[in-house]
Amino acid sequence: MSPLGRFSAVAQSRRQLNNVFRRFTSNEAPSVIVPGVRPIERIRNIGISAHIDSGKTTVTERILYYAGRIDSMHEVRGKDDVGATMDFMELERQRGITIQSAATYVDWHGTNINIIDTPGHVDFTVEVERALRVLDGAVLVLCGVGGVQSQTFTVNRQLARYNVPFICFVNKMDRNGASPLKALDGLRNKLNHNAALVHLPIGKDSNFNGIVDLVEGHALYYEGEGGLIVRKDEIPKDLRVEAEDRRQELIEHIANVDETLGEMFLNDQKPDVKQIHEAIRRTVVKRQFVPVLSGSALKNKGVQTMIDSVVKYLPDPSEVVNRATVKTETGEEKRIILSPERNNDKPFVGLAFKLEAGKYGQLTYFRVYQGQLSKGDTVYASRDGRKVRVQRLVRMHAADMEEITTAYAGDICATFGLDCHSGETFSTDQNLAPHCESMHIPEPVISMAIKPVNRKDADNFIKALTRFTKEDPTFRREYNQEAKETIVSGMGELHLEIYAQRMKSEYNCPVELGKPSVAYRECLGAPYKFHFRHKKQTGGQGQFGEIEGVIDPLPADRNTVVEFSDETFGNNIPKNLFPALKKGLDAIVAEGPLIKSRIAGIHVRIQDGATHAVDSTEIAMINTMQNMMRESFEKASWLLLEPIMKVEVTTPAEFQGNVVTSALSDMFGYTSELRSLTEGKGEFSMEYSRYAPTSLEAQDRVQAEWRQLHGIADPNEKGKKKKK
């Protein structure tokens, strides 16, 4: 049995990389590289996504090592205290979790793979959202023991939202109880995917030492230091029958959705290896099939084969249709398809998907969708037409930057000095003004009061809040005038705690966080018809506005937004006054009538009204809308909406009787309580699902607690005293 030693081209890749760039830190100037323009079919943009602790970052570390991007591997919670390359934040290394997405790229046998490693914790889900928005494919990492877990559902929804094709890598096959069949069952029955194994593990638990490649029909063993040598051999005798059965199952699942393979299957023709690979690629790109691979990143097994599958099965940028909205000469909007050609025949179009404060200023991450972007180019923001010059252009490798001169369609790059917001589209054509669809931003679910420990740190406190709220759209702040305190809102306790720790470590500003509170919303319980007249005469120019219509509660799937529509006929209310009405609505919904939480889930429909030629000014119409809403606070039926969370608790069977479901307000500090109830053996994860009305009893209790907190008397008690 002569081993066919196949090295993963590590030495060659390292030589190539060292010839074209050198990494630089904040203390040294970058060197410039001018790479050749790689063909579009040799580009892959992928994300590594998974439930927390499934091994995403370890998988990425192995990819970097086998591709020659790093010289040695380090673990997330390694004894050497170095930490994984992609977890470059100090807090990430301390906690052993990924907090923010990190970008890098590798060369794998002539294919450039741009990689974004994303967090697994639900509190940082916006990092996954903005990564998947700009990626063409993904690797979904599942734990061989846990299979499909709570956060897997969230990632699956995000993949579907952005129509991202993916392959599945079942990790941790060396652990006791690991099996790819559990993951396969979860993909099929929990996530409703057409999935099949393309790998069978060789050896169970700690004896796992290789895989059977069901497509190629041979065994692969990963040997040598760090698993660098991939040895090809015959399939072990005890696995040959199962391998044949699983291969047939694989072909059947593909044939169900692929016309070419389906015809061969019906005609009893056996497809060859090339035909199976091509069919897998066709169906993966169309999101009709999910191939399931196996391995153990920690034990250095299966990762090279997984990278090969990324190149074989996931789409290049030309195979993904990307669209933008532009305005025609008549002012109408139309959708255009962006060209993936890697040249400057068409104007540059790029999406700023992530902001990060660096030592050189704001770092803006871009996905180039069309044309090319070069250092020194002038680009225009589609939102407001402002003109910006690209002074520096870099590619990211975790915390390091490698300066480049030009980025082409399909590339992911970053630039400095671009004052913009996440989700903005830029173009080199001032007249094009394209708008790429932005990413989904989930609503915050908890709030905390926050203040600096020392008054002298007030300036740094404001700077930190301003920066963090700009970088992270799920981290929000507001100032409570009554309580005279700053309130921050986010996706969970960990989310807010991390920002508190970052204020201390990055701004030397220790802060105190108050008790968590639920981010309630206020909504109408039933439609409310209104006919409201605002009239004010003070000696000078008066104010006049009259509006008639209805406020409807929105359905459950849209109850986090406020909608406004003009349903008038004729010109009783001139069209140029509707922006003022909308402005008044946007301001008044910040505080509802129950506990001054934000109003959501309503649709204000203006059906008729009246105006005055002189007195119906912008401020008059703003006041008309706001006073109508204040009247509705008194007359309409209002409800509290609370966040409904999906909670997954993992605990030994003997402790299950002690673990019960709770309201979100009862889940604060639940980690400590669960550890106490389960002798430290229980774990739980929680993610936002939707907003729904509270019970009337809960609403009364929340209102009473809010009034007590703010020293406000119960209006019902006042009424009782008057009657006496």
Curated annotation (Swiss-Prot):
One Pfam family per UniProt: GTP_EFTU_D2
NCBIfam families for the chain: EF-G (TIGR00484), small_GTP (TIGR00231)
Protein keywords: Elongation factor, GTP-binding, Hydrolase, Mitochondrion, Nucleotide-binding, Protein biosynthesis, Transit peptide
Gene3D superfamilies the record matches: 3.30.230.10, 3.30.70.240, Elongation Factor G (Translational Gtpase), domain 3 (3.30.70.870), P-loop containing nucleotide triphosphate hydrolases (3.40.50.300), Translation factors (2.40.30.10)
Family indicated by similarity: Belongs to the TRAFAC class translation factor GTPase superfamily. Classic translation factor GTPase family. EF-G/EF-2 subfamily.
Task of the protein: Mitochondrial GTPase that catalyzes the GTP-dependent ribosomal translocation step during translation elongation. During this step, the ribosome changes from the pre-translocational (PRE) to the post-translocational (POST) state as the newly formed A-site-bound peptidyl-tRNA and P-site-bound deacylated tRNA move to the P and E sites, respectively. Catalyzes the coordinated movement of the two tRNA molecules, the mRNA and conformational changes in the ribosome.
A GO cellular-component term linked to this record: mitochondrion
Every tr-type G domain range: 41-318
Annotated organelle transit peptide span: 1-24
Gene symbol of the encoding locus: gfm-1
Keyword presence, Nucleotide-binding: yes
Pathway: Protein biosynthesis; polypeptide chain elongation
Chain residues that bind GTP: 50-57, 117-121, 171-174
Subcellular location: Mitochondrion
Protein name: Elongation factor G, mitochondrial
CDD domains reported for this sequence: EF-G, EFG_III, mtEFG1_II_like
Cited HAMAP family: EF_G_EF_2_B
GO molecular function: GTP binding; GTPase activity; translation elongation factor activity
One of the GO BP terms on file: mitochondrial translational elongation
UniProt source species: Caenorhabditis briggsae
Broadest EC class assigned to this enzyme: hydrolase
E.C. designation(s): 3.6.5.-
SMART domains in UniProt: EFG_C, EFG_IV
Reactions catalysed, as given in the entry: GTP + H2O = GDP + phosphate + H(+)
